[in-house]
Amino acid sequence: DADPRGELDLSDAVVVLDEVCRTCDADWTRSLMQRAGRVVCRNLGQVVIARELGVTFDVAAPVFCANRATLTWLRGLGAGRVYLPAELLGNDAERIAELAAEPGVWGPVDADRPELMVCEHCLLTAEGVCATDATGQVRCRDCLRRRQVRYLVERDGTRLPVAIDACGRTRIFLS
């Protein structure tokens, strides 16, 4: 949520980048990559930027690594660590054992709260008009609705937690 011009020292940090990287996010992403000790790329566009900048990077879902061929390809691109996707951990013990035997293969980035989906658009627009500033510009970071606890209720009554970030991206979680 901070301004990229704040230039915090992140040299000792591992920065896990967002799954979505819009064109308008490129400068912010580059700034984070240049200041971070290491970054975790969550899409191939970020991998391209990391390679251009020559920074140390890892790869995690939604970039899906489910076999040795993909692992070899990601390593060939320069990935130091590869995080296995949470979906794989629940389904295929044999494949996990094979991949986990390789150096630099880790479990999922966030196994405690697995995401079902990331939507590039804000689902709160279904409730009404977005928050705007004095000039009429939409300001997601100032939206009071996004700070409230929200759930998507499925037909069977299952309540899926929903979070909206400061850029208006919606995340729906499994639990």
Name each region found by the language model.
Residues D1-S175:
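Active-site pocket-lining/capping segments in soluble small-molecule metabolic enzymes
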